[in-house]
Regions:
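Short, structured motif recognition centered on aromatic/hydrophobic residues
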Residues: 10-13, 28, 70, 74
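Thiol-based oxidoreductase modules, predominantly thioredoxin-like and allied folds used
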Residues: 13-14, 22, 32, 37-56
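Cys/His-rich microdomains that often coordinate metals
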Residues: 25
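Short active-site neighborhood of thiol/selenol oxidoreductases, capturing the structured segment around
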Residues: 3-16
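Core residues of folded domains in eukaryotic genome-function proteins
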Residues: 6-9, 42, 66
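A short glycine-leucine-enriched loop at secondary-structure breakpoints
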Residues: 60-65
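Non-catalytic, surface beta->alpha helical segment in thiol-disulfide oxidoreductase systems
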Residues: 66-106
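The canonical Cys-X-X-Cys-His
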Residues: 18-21, 70
Length: 106
């Protein structure tokens, strides 16, 4: 799937050396793979953002105040979901992503 085909984008905000971010990476990868397989109709693109790459500027724009955190954007790059709770269980992360998408479709 090319970038133009994504209807939603989910971003994992992380930073190098963050112990919690490193603990979250396997959960993030597993969740992304499962959602891509289970919900292809959502056309979700998954990516990571190193918050140190722009000195937290992007995070400040969307009120993302720490790591690890997650955001969901629609195809117009509008923020439709922001989770700043840090480490999540896989079911919590999946629920956050799907609820963000479903609530934007109402």
């Amino acid at each position: 799937m090319t970038e133009q085909q994504f209807k939603y984008r989910v971003v994992f905000f992380q930073q190098p050396g963050c112990v919690a971010c490193n603990a979250m990476k396997p959960i993030w990868a597993e969740t992304a793979n499962e959602l891509a397989e289970e919900t292809p109709y959502y056309k979700i693109g998954f990516g990571e953002w190193d918050v140190t790459s722009d000195n937290w500027e992007f995070c400040d724009q969307i009120n993302c105040d720490g790591t690890p955190n997650f955001a969901v954007f629609n195809e117009d790059c509008e923020l439709i979901g922001l989770n700043t709770d840090g480490i999540l269980a896989k079911t919590q992360l999946k629920d956050f992503i799907t609820k963000s998408i479903e609530s934007s479709n109402k």
